[in-house]
C-alpha cells in the first residue's frame, strides 16, 4: 500500500465518509494513473440508488472545484462524470445541466508545473468533450445505448465462462484490485465478472463486432490519409533548393554543349530536331551580327548627321596631310547655314582646288594660308564662304585687311563672299600689294619722330613725310593732352545744378577758387602731362630764416645761411663739436651748382641747440683753425 492510499484511508475514517464517497475519492485520487474501469462501473451502479446518488454527486462536485495543484483530481472527476453520463442514471445528466456553469468555468483552467509544462490542457480538452455531450441530447442517447449493450454483453460473457476461466478472471481481478489498494478487493468474490481486464473488454467477442472494429479502423486510416499535407519543414526547403540548383546546372550544361557544336554529345546524338536547331544556330548568329552592324552604322550616321555633312565624291587632288582620309571631302552648303565652310589650317591647300566645307570646328579658309616654311600658294576665287560666328547678312563684309600682332598690316584681296582671312603663323606673301603695304606700314629710312629713339646711338632729328609730322611710338604728349584737358561734357555733368537743382546757384564754386596748374612745356616724352617742380621750396618760403647758434654767439646780423655769401671765410663762425658743419663753411669748389633749386634752404631745417649757450655753460672755446679740409 502506498503512502497516498494510507493517507486516504485515515481521512476516510476521520471524516466518516460513506462507502459511495470512499469509492469516488478512490477513483479521483491524486495518483499518476487513471481511474480503474471496474471501480467506475461500481460507482455507476450506485447512481441508481437515491441516497448513494446524492453522496456520489456531492463528492464529485467537490473534486471539480479543487485547486490548480490538484489538477489530477479535476481531470479524473471529469473522466468519471463522462462515464456516469453514458452508463449511470439519467439523473446524472439532469443535475449536470443544472450545474452547467460549474463545468463551463473549467474551460479556462490553467496550471504549469515545475518543468514548465501546462497541465491545464488536459482539463480543458476533457471539459469540451463533456460540454458537447451535454448539449447534444441525441448523441448522449446513442452513447448511453451503446454503453449499456456493451455492459450487458460483458455480464453475460462472465456468467457463461467455465469454472477455470472464471477462476482465472477472479484471480486476475483480485490481483489487479489489491495492487492498487482498492477497498473493492475485499468484495471481489461478489463482483468477479466486473473486474475483468480492459483487454478482455476491448477484444471482440463475435464476428459482427470484429467486422465493426475493422470498418472503424479503415475509416480512421482513411481520415488520416485525407488530412491536408503539413507545410514542408526547413529540411524539405533545403532539399528543394538543392534540387533546383541541380536542375539549373544541368540546363546550363546543356546550353554550353549546344553552343560548342560538334564537340558536344548532342552533335552525335539522334534527333532531327536537335540537328535542325544546330543548323539554324549559324544563321541566328549571322542575323545577330548583321543587326549589331546596322545598329552601329545607324548610330555613326546619326552622329555624322549632327556633326559632319554628307559625304562627297572623292576629289582628284592629293593631300599632303598624313592623317587626311582620302575621298572624304564634304560638300559645300549654302551660305545661310549655321556651320560655315572652313578648312584645316594645318594642311596645305594646293592651287586649283576648290575650297570645300570641312568640320565645323575647323578654322575658316585663309587666302594666304600655307605652312610657315613653305611657299605661299595663290588661290583662285572659289565659292562663297561664310563665317559661322559672323552675321548672316549678305551685304555684310568683314574688313579686307587683317592685323598682324607681330608685324605690319597686310592687305588681302576679298573673296566673293566678302570674308577676309588671316593666318598669324603664315609667311607674308611676296606680292606687289603686300610690298606696297609693307612700305607704307614699315618706317622709312627717315626718322618719323622728333627724336628718333636709338638705344645705342645719339638722338637724331626727324623730318616730316608728306607734309605732316608722323607720331612717335613713345610720344605720350597726345595722351597727356587728353588727360589734362577734360571734356566739356564731363564738366557739364559735374555741375551742381545737374543734380541739386536751381537751389545750388547760391553755393560757392570751388573750381573757380582753385586755379588749374599750368602744363610745363618740356621735350621729355616721359614727363608729358606732369607739372614741373617748383623752383622754390613750398615749405620754407613763408618762414623767416632762424639764426644759427654760431650767429647768435658772434652777434652777426645775418638771419640765415641762405642770405650770406657762398664764399664766406671759414673763420667767420665758431665751430661746435655737437653741431653739424654749416653750408657756409664748405669750400667754394665743393658747392652745388646754382641750377639745382630743389633742395630747401638750410636755415629752415637747422637743428635746435643740444648744448647750453657759451654764456651760461662757461668760457668760450677757442676758435677752430682754418684749413681746407671740409670734414674738420
Curated annotation (Swiss-Prot):
Name assigned to this protein: Epsin-3
Residues annotated as domain UIM: 209-228, 236-255
Chain segments carrying region 3 X 3 AA repeats of N-P-F: 524-631
Residue spans of biased composition, Basic and acidic residues class: 276-294
Gene induction: In keratinocytes, by wounding or contact with collagen.
Subcellular location: Cytoplasm; Cytoplasm, Perinuclear region; Cytoplasmic vesicle, Clathrin-coated vesicle; Nucleus
UniProt Sequence repeat ranges: 321-323, 344-346, 371-373, 387-389, 404-406, 524-526, 537-539, 629-631
GO CC, one annotated term: perinuclear region of cytoplasm
Gene Ontology MF, one: clathrin binding
Residue ranges annotated for the ENTH domain, each copy included: 12-144
Tissue expression: Detected in migrating keratinocytes from wounded skin, but not in differentiating keratinocytes or in normal skin. Detected in chronic wounds, basal cell carcinoma and ulcerative colitis.
Region (5 X 3 AA repeats of [DE]-P-W): 321-406
Family matches, as SMART domains: ENTH (SM00273), UIM (SM00726)
UniProt family annotation: Belongs to the epsin family.
Gene3D superfamilies named in the record: 1.25.40.90
Source organism per UniProt: Homo sapiens
Location of Phosphoserine modifications: 191-192, 264
Region (Disordered): 172-214, 257-296, 326-501, 525-560, 604-632
Single GO BP term: endocytosis
Keywords associated with the record: Cytoplasm, Cytoplasmic vesicle, Lipid-binding, Nucleus, Phosphoprotein, Repeat
UniProt xrefs under Pfam families: ENTH (PF01417), UIM (PF02809)
Stretches with biased composition (Polar residues): 353-371
Keyword field contains Phosphoprotein: yes
Binding site for a 1,2-diacyl-sn-glycero-3-phospho-(1D-myo-inositol-4,5-bisphosphate): 8, 11, 25, 30, 63, 73
Amino acid at each position: 500500500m502506498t503512502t497516498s492510499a494510507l493517507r486516504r484511508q485515515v481521512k476516510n475514517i476521520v471524516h466518516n465518509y460513506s462507502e459511495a464517497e470512499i469509492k469516488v475519492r478512490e477513483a479521483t485520487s491524486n495518483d499518476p494513473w487513471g481511474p480503474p474501469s471496474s471501480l467506475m462501473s461500481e460507482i455507476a451502479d450506485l447512481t441508481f440508488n437515491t441516497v448513494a446518488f446524492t453522496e456520489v454527486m456531492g463528492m464529485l462536485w467537490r473534486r471539480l472545484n479543487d485547486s490548480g495543484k490538484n489538477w489530477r483530481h479535476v481531470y479524473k472527476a471529469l473522466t468519471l462524470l463522462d462515464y456516469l453520463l453514458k452508463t449511470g442514471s439519467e439523473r446524472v445528466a439532469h443535475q449536470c445541466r443544472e450545474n452547467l456553469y460549474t463545468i463551463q468555468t473549467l474551460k479556462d483552467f490553467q496550471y504549469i508545473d515545475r518543468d514548465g509544462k501546462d497541465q491545464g490542457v488536459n482539463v480543458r480538452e476533457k471539459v469540451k468533450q463533456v460540454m458537447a455531450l451535454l448539449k447534444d441530447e441525441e448523441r448522449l442517447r446513442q452513447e448511453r445505448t451503446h454503453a449499456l449493450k456493451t455492459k450487458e454483453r460483458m455480464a453475460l460473457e462472465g456468467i457463461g465462462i467455465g469454472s477455470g476461466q472464471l477462476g482465472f478472471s477472479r484471480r486476475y481481478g483480485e490481483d489487479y484490485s489489491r495492487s492498487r489498494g482498492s477497498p473493492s478487493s475485499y468484495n471481489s468474490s461478489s463482483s468477479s465478472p466486473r473486474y475483468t481486464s480492459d483487454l478482455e473488454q476491448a477484444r471482440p467477442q463475435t464476428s459482427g463486432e470484429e467486422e465493426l472494429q475493422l470498418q472503424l479502423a479503415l475509416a480512421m486510416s482513411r481520415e488520416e490519409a485525407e488530412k491536408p499535407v503539413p507545410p514542408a519543414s526547413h529540411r524539405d526547403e533545403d532539399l528543394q533548393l538543392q534540387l533546383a540548383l541541380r536542375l539549373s546546372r544541368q540546363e546550363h550544361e546543356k546550353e554550353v554543349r549546344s553552343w560548342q557544336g560538334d564537340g558536344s554529345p548532342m552533335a552525335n546524338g539522334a534527333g532531327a530536331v536537335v540537328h535542325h536547331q544546330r543548323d539554324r544556330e549559324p544563321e541566328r548568329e549571322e542575323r545577330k551580327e548583321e543587326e549589331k552592324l546596322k545598329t552601329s552604322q545607324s548610330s555613326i550616321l546619326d552622329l555624322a548627321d549632327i556633326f559632319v555633312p554628307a559625304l562627297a565624291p572623292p576629289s582628284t587632288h592629293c593631300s599632303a596631310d598624313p592623317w587626311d582620309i582620302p575621298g572624304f571631302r564634304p560638300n559645300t552648303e549654302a551660305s545661310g547655314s549655321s556651320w560655315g565652310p572652313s578648312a584645316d589650317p594645318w594642311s596645305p591647300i594646293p592651287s586649283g582646288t576648290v575650297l570645300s566645307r570641312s568640320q565645323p570646328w575647323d578654322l575658316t579658309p585663309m587666302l594666304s594660308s600655307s605652312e610657315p616654311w613653305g611657299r605661299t600658294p595663290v588661290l583662285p576665287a572659289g565659292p562663297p564662304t561664310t563665317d559661322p560666328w559672323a552675321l548672316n547678312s549678305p551685304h555684310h563684309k568683314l574688313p579686307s585687311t587683317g592685323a598682324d600682332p607681330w608685324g605690319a598690316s597686310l592687305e588681302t584681296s576679298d573673296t566673293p563672299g566678302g570674308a577676309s582671312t588671316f593666318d598669324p603663323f603664315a609667311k607674308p606673301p611676296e606680292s606687289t600689294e603686300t610690298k606696297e603695304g609693307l612700305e607704307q606700314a614699315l618706317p622709312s629710312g627717315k626718322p618719323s619722330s622728333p627724336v628718333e629713339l636709338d638705344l645705342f646711338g645719339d638722338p637724331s632729328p626727324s623730318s616730316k613725310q608728306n607734309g605732316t609730322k608722323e607720331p612717335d611710338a613713345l610720344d605720350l604728349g597726345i595722351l597727356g593732352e587728353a588727360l589734362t584737358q577734360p571734356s566739356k561734357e564731363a564738366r557739364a555733368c559735374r555741375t551742381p545744378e545737374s543734380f541739386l537743382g536751381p537751389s545750388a546757384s547760391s553755393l560757392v564754386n570751388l573750381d573757380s577758387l582753385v586755379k588749374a596748374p599750368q602744363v610745363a612745356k618740356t621735350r621729355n616724352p616721359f614727363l608729358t602731362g606732369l607739372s614741373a617742380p617748383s623752383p622754390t621750396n613750398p615749405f620754407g618760403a613763408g618762414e623767416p630764416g632762424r639764426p644759427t647758434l654760431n650767429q647768435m654767439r658772434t652777434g652777426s646780423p645775418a638771419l640765415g645761411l641762405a642770405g650770406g655769401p657762398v664764399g664766406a671765410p671759414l673763420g667767420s663762425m665758431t665751430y661746435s663739436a655737437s653741431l653739424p658743419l654749416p653750408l657756409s663753411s664748405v669750400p667754394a669748389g665743393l658747392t652745388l651748382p646754382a641750377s639745382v633749386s630743389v633742395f630747401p634752404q638750410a636755415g629752415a631745417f637747422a637743428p635746435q641747440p643740444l648744448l647750453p649757450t657759451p654764456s651760461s655753460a662757461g668760457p668760450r672755446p677757442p676758435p677752430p683753425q682754418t684749413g681746407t679740409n671740409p670734414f674738420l
